[in-house]
Amino acid sequence: SIPCAESCVWIPCTVTALLGCSCSDKVCYN
């Protein structure tokens, strides 16, 4: 999986979620 430039510690993945990224271990991964 490729780490996206967004974290999801306090809020879920937002912008990167539109690119197919999902939360994993506090970081958004594609």
Curated annotation (Swiss-Prot):
Task: Name the UniProt key words of this record, in alphabetical order.
Answer: Disulfide bond, Knottin, Plant defense
Q: How is it modified after translation?
A: This is a cyclic peptide.
| Pfam families hit by this protein | Cyclotide (PF03784)
Entry's Gene Ontology BP terms: cytolysis in another organism; defense response
- What is the annotated tissue distribution of the protein whose record heads this document? Detected in stems (at protein level).
> Where on the tree of life does the source sit, at the highest rank?
Eukaryota
Q: Which family does it belong to?
A: Belongs to the cyclotide family. Bracelet subfamily.
Q: What does this protein do?
A: Probably participates in a plant defense mechanism. Has cytotoxic activity against HUVEC cells (LC(50)= 1.83 uM) and various cancer cells including HeLa (LC(50)= 1.81 uM), MCF-7 and K562. Displays very weak hemolytic activity.
Protein name listed in UniProt: Cyclotide hyen-M
